[in-house]
Amino acid sequence: MLFLMDVGIGAGSGLVLSVPALLWLEKERQKKGEKKPWHTAGVCLFAFLLAGIVTVTGIPALYRLRFDANVNLIPMAELFSNFSQYLKNMILFVPFGFFVPLLWKRERMVEKTVSIGFLFSLFIELMQLFSMRATDIDDLLMNTWGTWVGYLLFRGVLRIMPGICERFGAGENPGLDGFFCEGDKPSGKEAAVRAESPVCRLEMELCFGIVLLLMLTLQPLIAEALWELLYR
């Protein structure tokens, strides 16, 4: 119960802090001629997911960083003795692998989605060098595997609900692998608008940056204050 409360407070406060910046991104998108409320709702849910992952993995606030390396570089050494933990690490990143290609059309190649999941997991593991937690290659492998499973889930849902891409997706799909969803191919004025919009090109990176910056600075202070109120 305390674990669920901790995740709820961490992810919820991270989302609340991120909402103003995410709404600003939507406003900038509307200025360029794209109005996508479902996409904005999806980005907010993705921000909640990022904040939840940061909370669960115990990334420390910047003002609490203290180098205390505990590193495991031997892959799958405890696969059978600690299988449930391997499974949890994989499941943690399944929603991540689903939402990235759903929300951003230019990330709809499996290589891009899995690479993003790998880099995010690598960031987490490197930060855990400063959090008195273990930096484990198994976590990196299972998180990346979970991202791939999430991508497969996205492709499966796409077969059942082909219109979901256009409803939640934004930006332009270059179609480098020949994979286009319904409505992915812009033309005429719409293509020109998208090509000129830096928000379309950088929205995912901005979302990551905003959420991670807030989770490493302001959010821990707010979470501490909320816990103090609960236990008064």
Describe each region flagged by the PLM.
Residues 1-126, 130-132, 152-232:
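Bulky hydrophobic segments
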